[in-house]
Amino acid sequence: MAKDIKFSADARAAMVRGVDMLADTVKVTLGPKGRNVVLEKAFGSPLITNDGVTIAKEIELEDHFENMGAKLVSEVASKTNDIAGDGTTTATVLTQAIVHEGLKNVTAGANPIGIRRGIETATATAVEALKAIAQPVSGKEAIAQVAAVSSRSEKVGEYISEAMERVGNDGVITIEESRGMETELEVVEGMQFDRGYLSQYMVTDNEKMVADLENPFILITDKKVSNIQDILPLLEEVLKTNRPLLIIADDVDGEALPTLVLNKIRGTFNVVAVKAPGFGDRRKAMLEDIAILTGGTVITEDLGLELKDATMTALGQAAKITVDKDSTVIVEGSGSSEAIANRIALIKSQLETTTSDFDREKLQERLAKLAGGVAVIKVGAPTETALKEMKLRIEDALNATRAAVEEGIVAGGGTALITVIEKVAALELEGDDATGRNIVLRALEEPVRQIALNAGYEGSVIIDKLKNSPAGTGFNAATGEWVDMIKTGIIDPVKVTRSALQNAASVASLILTTEAVVANKPEPAAPAPAMPAGMDPGMMGGF
């Protein structure tokens, strides 16, 4: 395919047009008085949202050079969302500001490499200054406040706070659509996996159709159990204890399943069999998780173990297990806390190195199940459009809250970025490096300027007053008042603010140091097919 190439100023100018189109669309959503953006969808009703990354991902420009600029800013938003889960609009605003200020200086003859050095030094200083003024977040009320600010709903703040209290910081909190109009919280404590009993005759409660096992033993294997003789010695040992047994296996079939069911019906033995969760290597990992949680051993050929040789020491134990037709929940496994902690640490290290979103999601699920449970926030709304918008807000709030617990909080509304200006300005740099520092100084003002503009105020006036206000005092754009930001509950997680600044500086520097851009030339439109011979042209308009 033929290529179209632009150089130097032409290349940068084309990319900046794309940066502006995307940033101008996204930045109208910033702050408590931010506006909404309506996105056309191929199917169904349009999506109304003020979520920066959702808007950025939808934008595709016709001009290839402009589209590359837009996609780079979209990458800033996506990267910030991946790291911190929020702050995507702030990152977009900062990127546009650094690109614009930088381009003025590059056009005037400044060296882009020197400017990039200055931007990197100033950004690193600003990040350290942000960390220095951070305040830790602890306690249910503080967590609820962070979530309420991000979601713009006190009720959502309460749900997220309660969910995090119930399942811990490592617990999985999922967001689903409710069948009703109300938003509600549901918590499943213990380890749950999506496999139910293999026979309905194994239930202990015929009304609810569930099997409740109190203080059971657990046999865990990745093998298929077809011959009852393979597990008979073990069954006899368990029978002597008069305690129930849960069998988790690749499958239970052949003569084994009817034999177990028959003994259950006769009241000889309380046993429930379920299939192992997951597939392939993920199944092996999940079985190992269950074994560690319950203090058992996975009977597997990988360890040279056979079912017929298994002893009572290989069985896991738990306080209670509930099995229905679709799922199994293990509560209070008997595994050692040290072994569980080591397993959690291993999964966390795998999370840090994985590049697959799917693998990351599955690892987080495993982490949550080991750490204590799963909370589900079921979102209700009067219309489908409102439901989609509410789900996006709650996702942002949940991510922001986790980030706040992890690294602490600073004054919100862009106030913290103004606070660190003094530290950045104190950097002693020369030449183009100093120019890079000054570009960052100007960009740090931009989020406050945009928040004020969206609320109907003059940004420059607000910034001047903010610079001369006591530490911690900021402008509440929702009410038009000057307040103590943290006491009022207007806060931002440090992780969100620093990620937005770091990602913006990184991509903006790349754009400023771009000297050539290569794009695909548009393909010429294919000619219309020739009309069949003898066909009357008038016939084409007959319908």
From Swiss-Prot:
One GO biological-process annotation of the entry reads: protein refolding
* A Gene Ontology term for the protein's cellular component: cytoplasm
Compartments (UniProt record): Cytoplasm
Binding of ATP occurs at: T29, L30, G31, P32, D86, G87, T88, T89, T90, G413, N476, A477, A478, D492
Q: What is its EC number?
A: 5.6.1.7
Chief location bin: cytoplasm
Q: Does the keyword Phosphoprotein apply?
A: no
CDD domains referenced in this protein's UniProt entry, alphabetically:
GroEL (cd03344)
**InterPro entries per the UniProt record, alphabetical:** Chaperonin_Cpn60_CS, Cpn60/GroEL, Cpn60/GroEL/TCP-1, GroEL-like_apical_dom_sf, GROEL-like_equatorial_sf, TCP-1-like_intermed_sf
GO MF term list: ATP binding; ATP-dependent protein folding chaperone; isomerase activity; unfolded protein binding
Task: Name the keywords, alphabetized.
Answer: ATP-binding, Chaperone, Cytoplasm, Isomerase, Nucleotide-binding
Protein origin, superkingdom: Bacteria
- Alphabetical list of SUPFAM superfamilies matching this protein: GroEL apical domain-like, GroEL equatorial domain-like, GroEL-intermediate domain like
Family indicated by similarity: Belongs to the chaperonin (HSP60) family.
Assembly, in brief, is:
Forms a cylinder of 14 subunits composed of two heptameric rings stacked back-to-back. Interacts with the co-chaperonin GroES.
Q: What does this protein do?
A: Together with its co-chaperonin GroES, plays an essential role in assisting protein folding. The GroEL-GroES system forms a nano-cage that allows encapsulation of the non-native substrate proteins and provides a physical environment optimized to promote and accelerate protein folding.
User: Under what name is this protein listed?
Assistant: Chaperonin GroEL
Which species is listed as the source?
Answer: Streptococcus pyogenes serotype M18 (strain MGAS8232)
